[in-house]
UniProtKB/Swiss-Prot annotation:
Name used for this protein in its record: NAD kinase
Task of the protein: Involved in the regulation of the intracellular balance of NAD and NADP, and is a key enzyme in the biosynthesis of NADP. Catalyzes specifically the phosphorylation on 2'-hydroxyl of the adenosine moiety of NAD to yield NADP.
One GO term (biological process): NAD metabolic process
UniProt: NAD(+) binding residues: 80-81, 154-155, 182, 184, 195-200, 219, 253
EC number(s) given by UniProt: 2.7.1.23
GO cellular component term, pick one: cytoplasm
Active site: 80 (proton acceptor)
Predominant localisation class: cytoplasm
UniProt keyword terms in alphabetical order: ATP-binding, Cytoplasm, Kinase, NAD, NADP, Nucleotide-binding, Transferase
Top EC class for this record: transferase
Length: 298
């Protein structure tokens, strides 16, 4: 039986310079997956930096954007952070992603590295669960001009520096004033990001099918300042009204330094990310496994 995905790319997490043993391990993992994919009668492409850092230069290579233009499927080897970065860069191309977990928790990179072949074979032949996640589009407005913009799959976070005091943030939703918040910061999280930083700050978990966001204050000065669930059709504006050493980050990977009066606008992006999971995948099973929920009977 021929695979339905003919051109398959692999993007891997690789260690920094000097980590020899980790580099050898990364090479072995990527090479094993590459060989497996070619054995499935697929045309393999390695992401260029992955190939360079692992020394696997015998394979066809493309940069991430080239993968988006030319490949039918992308296998991401690493943790959720790796998947977030790849997902944002490929969102505009509609390339489906499969995560092979080489990290720790693995909410969206859900296929274990050990035994990945058993999970991956049916997916390559068209037997999978599709899971589409929305992205957020954010920009930093300064004196009426956008000075920084980024996509986020998990969250947009405005917070204070490590040695500064609380920040004061004016929050509006669709142009309607909500509150002035004094806190360590504020999180705007998607359903995907609701199990990340927002959860540790006391926010609720949103099912991926819910078209919403959650607005979560970080250590607020007023204890009645609680998380709010919003429609993702709204535009959230966060204005820096007070404080110093303030920044905005997007999926904890892109960072913008903020000034007094800056406004961060967050709206739903036109782009989405499509994850493919093994048949039988369940969001609730993922929560039980990753969060250690009790599974016993009465």
């Amino acid at each position: 039986m021929k695979p339905i995905f003919r051109r398959v790319a692999v993007i891997g997490k690789y260690p920094g310079p000097g980590a020899v043993s980790a580099s050898d391990s990364a090479r072995q993992i990527i090479e094993s997956i590459a060989q497996f994919v070619t054995q499935q009668d697929c045309e393999l492409t390695l992401e260029a930096e992955t190939a360079a850092h692992t020394g696997l230069t015998q394979y066809h290579t493309l940069d991430v954007e080239g993968i988006g233009r030319q490949c039918d499927l992308c296998l991401v080897v690493g943790g959720d952070g790796t998947m977030l970065g790849v997902g944002r860069r490929l969102a505009g191309y509609g390339t489906p992603l499969v995560g092979i977990n080489q990290g720790r928790l693995g909410f969206i990179t859900d296929i274990p590295l050990e035994g990945y072949q058993d999970a991956l074979t049916p997916i390559l032949h068209g037997d999978y669960e599709e899971d589409v996640r929305p992205l957020m589009q954010a920009c930093v407005m300064r004196s009426g001009e956008c000075v920084f913009e980024a996509l986020a799959l998990n969250d947009v976070v405005v917070n204070r520096g490590s040695t500064s005091g609380m920040v004061e943030l004016r929050v509006e939703v669709d142009g309607v004033f909500v509150s002035n918040q004094r806190a360590d910061g504020l999180i705007v999280a998607s359903p995907t990001g609701s199990t990340a930083y927002a959860l540790s700050a006391g926010g609720p978990m949103l099912h991926p099918s819910i078209p919403g966001w959650v607005l979560v204050p970080i250590a607020p000065h007023t204890l009645s300042n609680r998380p709010i669930v919003l429609s993702d059709a709204t535009e959230v504006a966060i204005e820096v009204a007070g404080g110093r050493d303030i920044s905005a980050n997007f999926d904890m990977q892109s960072l913008a330094s903020l000034q007094h009066g800056d406004r961060i606008l967050v709206r739903r992006s036109a782009h989405r990310v499509c994850f493919l999971h093994p048949r039988g995948w369940s969001y609730f099973a993922t929560l039980r496994k990753k969060l250690g929920w009790y599974e016993g009977g009465s």
